[in-house]
Amino acid sequence: CSPNSMGIHNLEKNIRISPFVFPSDLITGGIAMIIQSGSVLGALTNNDRRLRYNFFVSSGSENVTNASDYLLWALKQPSTSVVGMFLESVRDPVLFIEGLKLAKEKDIPIVILKVGRTEASSKLALSHTGALVGDFEVFKAVIEKYNAHLVYSIDEMAASLQVFSHYQTIERKGIASIHDSGGERELIVDIADDLSVPFARLSKETREKLTNVLEPTMDTNNPLDAWGSGHDADKLFKNAFLHLLSDKNVSL
């Protein structure tokens, strides 16, 4: 790759070119990961074994091959279900946008953690790998145009990669959720509103079924607070969950 690189690993072909030792028990999967920080790569690969990779690379200073080159290659692999990128900068914007377009065409999610969003961190990136970071708002606008996903922490990146690696298309209806707390119900309504995620309008039939399993004082609004007194909670939650799941207006 180049200086500041921790190497390249193709788990499908069992090819590992690296001066560092990575875990030997990694399981092959559909996550392609392109990281401009060796330590971040180490943190992700040494952490959650539910993250299963077909390929990962620490691209370092990118003297020859850059992150956009790796992105295009990863998107052309049949096994790639999601791409994760940790970026200080984009050295080839035209090629990067070509990759974003291809990902959108192939319906392959891209999860991007972009650092260097502030003046102070931009200077650190320049001293680290010689990367000129550029304007974050411009970068963000490009990402949003092509439906890639910006995250803001390594934890959020790991969680997003895990979710998208099991990605299935769901119908555009609405979600339903069930809780043991009125406060939790209020919290999820706020979060869903922030993300523009709609709640399903439960059918009359579902509401009648819920009325028959919930305690008399409980309402049947979605999201559902099903706790009541907590009596026979396991059975109550199971039945309420199944009724929500069977509603024709609920997609998730």
Where are these regions (language model features)?
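Catalytic-core regions of core metabolic enzymes
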Residues: 1-252
